[in-house]
């Protein structure tokens, strides 16, 4: 080969190649046709056959510059060749740097640049893995879909309402249930104890259900679980305190022994068929609250659960914002975020602010007995009440069944900490002076049977409110409970007690994120699609608007409804069909046996009263042989309405006679309807009221 004075120039004419960013300096680089083609976007395509032929002829290669092209612009044939390099098109080593004794370049070797290319015979190329990169602390995300099966998100409760939270995540033959809560009855549900979701779809697909994951231990998220597990017995996964509270409910329902409860902590991942769920720590008004990262074949979902961002939490456990950000960097297909406070600007104050208010109010109470009403599940609030009581030398009494249960379980699991003998039994408080006593009680929402409400009515068996009581209601009324709370406050003040209930006193903070906190989650997660959850429609709509402000396209957001099936793919989100989701009412031990007709009758009875008409007719002649008698309940006072009732009896007699058919035959339905129509018209003309009319006709 003729001597080349400028060796670098010759190499530059032979090959143009850009060193890979991932290759360390001073490392030998193998060049194959695949490598050259893959970098043709910057330097143009190189004909390796021509290069090899030129070397055999001992002539330098003349390179003709070409316009740079993108790899995606290459013909499909060239792309295929780039993926499958041919063995015969390998080049020989033309130059190597000096090496140390172990066969590696010396550390002080001159760095490789684009013009300093070392070409060597490539080693056998390893087959590239087709699996996607595994996120830290999470199961490997699935590769790109090929069958295009959509992921189904089916809310059975919690949308367009407060409470009854329950959502299904379904992919092919796998269903994972998120939460299973209850709701309290509305004013138009007389006699109803509580409301739970409709489990019809779950029961129909029981073979697909892989498990239940719970975000936290509030009633609107775990209250209906015992009813579900009686129908579909599947594993339940959640954090320690949540599982502890669930144990009590299942024990009361008599199904604890046959239930499978599994304790998980933040960072743990549960694989349920094709769906995996990772627990992520969040702040809320109860310890051990979690959000979820849900890994599916379609993509990753993030469900925040009920959350807030508290930088000074009472228990020192902060929300794992770093993990939310990490998920965002790996790519999140859809975000499902708490919408409860999406209307409120700014950030939710820290729970510690309430503790500071307690300190001020306890000092103001002086030598009076202190009563504090709060949500029984707000363990952080209870801890701060106890801490303040200890600092002021007061013993603590707990009143109210749910408060007693939660306090006992939280103490057992180590979530409530206090000096020994701080909490005393309610029967021991008689010997404790008022200035040394604090009573923590239920009833912050004015519930009719709660401890505080019974105290206000003078019906509590062991606690009587006096003018020497200082009462703090550490909660704000849930929408719809304002009248109940107001009545309790009025009754307590009538008894002479001083009641502190104003929100301006700092005695309550929310456990839900306001707009700036939701913005923070959006900034970290960066979802492609957004599905607002947990709230009335106005809350969901405000959260949708916030998502648009944060850059999520409007068409990528769907405000769902209970029972509407949301289908999610890599490229779309839409509502396609519905499943049964009627509210199931629980009345005593009856579940679902009270429907809209029964409620209508109850409402009618409560508003207009009842009139019962009893008559006996001869089966042969059709003549009325006894009655008709009229009985009134809740309609008019009998002693003052004798004339009205006498006329009502005559109207019924005429109606029965007029309805007699040919040959004395009578249709019972016609008889009853005739009595209802004619008596109803008469009573309305006299009273402008429409009582329920119940005809009872016997035949002899």
Outline where the language-model segments fall.
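Hard-cation-handling environments
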Residues: 344-474, 478-503, 507-663, 672, ...
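Hydrophobic/aromatic hotspots within intrinsically disordered, low-complexity regions
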Residues: 4, 15, 29-31, 36-37, ...
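C-terminal tails and terminal domains of large nucleic-acid-associated
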Residues: 664-700
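Arg/Lys-rich, glycine/proline-spaced intrinsically disordered segments
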Residues: 63-69, 73-74, 81-88, 92-96, ...
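His/Asp/Glu-rich metal-coordinating catalytic cores
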Residues: 116, 121-213, 218-431, 450-464, ...
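Short glycine-rich phosphate-binding loop at a beta-alpha junction
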Residues: 235, 531, 694-697
């Amino acid at each position: 080969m003729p001597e080349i004075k400028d060796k670098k120039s010759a190499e530059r004419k032979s090959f143009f190649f850009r060193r890979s960013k991932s290759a360390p300096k001073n490392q030998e680089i193998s060049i194959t046709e695949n490598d050259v083609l893959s970098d043709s976007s910057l330097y143009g395509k190189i004909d390796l056959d021509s290069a090899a032929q030129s070397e055999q002829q001992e002539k330098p290669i003349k390179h003709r510059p070409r316009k740079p092209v993108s790899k995606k612009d290459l013909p499909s044939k060239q792309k295929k060749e780039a993926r499958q390099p041919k063995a015969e098109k390998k080049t020989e080593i033309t130059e190597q740097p000096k090496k140390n004794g172990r066969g590696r370049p010396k550390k002080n070797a001159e760095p490789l640049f684009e013009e300093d290319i070392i070409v060597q015979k490539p080693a056998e190329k390893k087959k590239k893995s087709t699996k996607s990169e595994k996120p830290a602390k999470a199961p490997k995300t699935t590769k790109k879909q090929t069958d295009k099966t959509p992921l189904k998100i089916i809310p059975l409760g919690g949308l367009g309402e407060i409470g009854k939270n329950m959502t299904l995540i379904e992919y092919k033959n796998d269903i994972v249930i998120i939460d299973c809560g209850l709701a309290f009855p509305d004013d138009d549900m007389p006699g109803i104890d509580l409301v739970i979701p409709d489990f019809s779809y779950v029961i129909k697909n029981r073979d697909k259900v892989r498990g239940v994951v719970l975000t936290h231990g509030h009633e609107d998220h775990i209250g209906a679980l015992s009813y579900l597990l009686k129908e579909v017995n599947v594993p339940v996964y959640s954090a320690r305190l949540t599982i502890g509270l669930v144990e009590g409910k299942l024990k009361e329902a008599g199904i604890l022994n046959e239930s499978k409860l599994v304790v998980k902590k933040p960072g743990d991942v549960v694989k349920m068929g094709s769906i995996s769920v990772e627990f992520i720590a969040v702040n809320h008004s109860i310890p051990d609250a979690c959000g979820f990262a849900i890994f599916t074949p379609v993509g990753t979902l993030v469900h925040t659960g009920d959350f807030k961002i508290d930088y000074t939490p009472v228990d020192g456990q902060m929300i794992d914002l770093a993990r939310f950000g990490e998920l965002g960097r790996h790519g999140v297909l859809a975000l499902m975020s708490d919408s409860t406070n999406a209307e409120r600007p700014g950030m939710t104050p820290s729970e510690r602010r309430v503790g500071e208010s307690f300190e001020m109010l306890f000092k103001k109470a002086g030598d009076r007995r202190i009563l504090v009403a709060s949500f029984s599940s707000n363990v952080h609030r209870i801890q701060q009440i106890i801490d303040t009581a200890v600092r002021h030398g007061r013993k603590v009494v707990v009143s109210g069944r749910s408060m007693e249960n939660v306090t006992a379980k939280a103490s057992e699991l180590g979530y409530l900490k206090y000096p020994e003998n701080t909490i005393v039994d309610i029967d021991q408080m008689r010997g404790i002076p008022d200035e040394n006593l604090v009573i923590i009680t239920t009833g912050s929402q004015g519930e009719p049977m709660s401890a505080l409400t019974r105290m206000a009515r003078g019906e509590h068996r062991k606690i009587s409110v006096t003018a020497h009581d200082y009462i703090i209601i550490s909660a704000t009324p849930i929408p719809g409970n304002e009248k109940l709370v107001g009545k309790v406050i009025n009754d307590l003040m009538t008894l002479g007690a001083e009641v502190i209930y104003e929100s301006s006193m700092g005695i309550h903070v929310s456990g839900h994120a306001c707009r700036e906190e939701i913005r923070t989650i959006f900034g970290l997660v960066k979802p492609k699609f957004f599905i607002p959850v947990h709230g009335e429609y106005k809350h969901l709509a405000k959260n949708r608007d916030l998502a648009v402000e944060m850059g999520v396209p409007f068409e990528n957001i769907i405000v769902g409804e209970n029972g509407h099936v949301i289908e999610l793919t890599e490229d779309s989100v839409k509502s396609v069909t519905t499943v049964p989701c009627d509210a199931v009412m629980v009345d005593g031990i009856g579940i679902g046996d009270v429907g809209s007709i029964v409620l209508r009758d109850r409402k009618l009875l409560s508003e207009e009263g009842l009139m019962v008409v009893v008559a006996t007719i001869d089966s042969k002649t059709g003549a009325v042989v006894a009655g008709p008698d009229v009985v009134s309940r809740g309609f008019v006072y009998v002693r003052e309405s004798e004339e009205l009732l006498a006329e009502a009896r005559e109207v019924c007699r005429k109606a029965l006679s007029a309805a007699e058919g040919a040959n004395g035959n009578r249709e019972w339905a016609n008889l009853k309807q005739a009595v209802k129509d004619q008596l109803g018209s008469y009573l309305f003309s006299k009273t402008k009221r429409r009582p329920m009319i119940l005809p009872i006709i016997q035949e002899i």
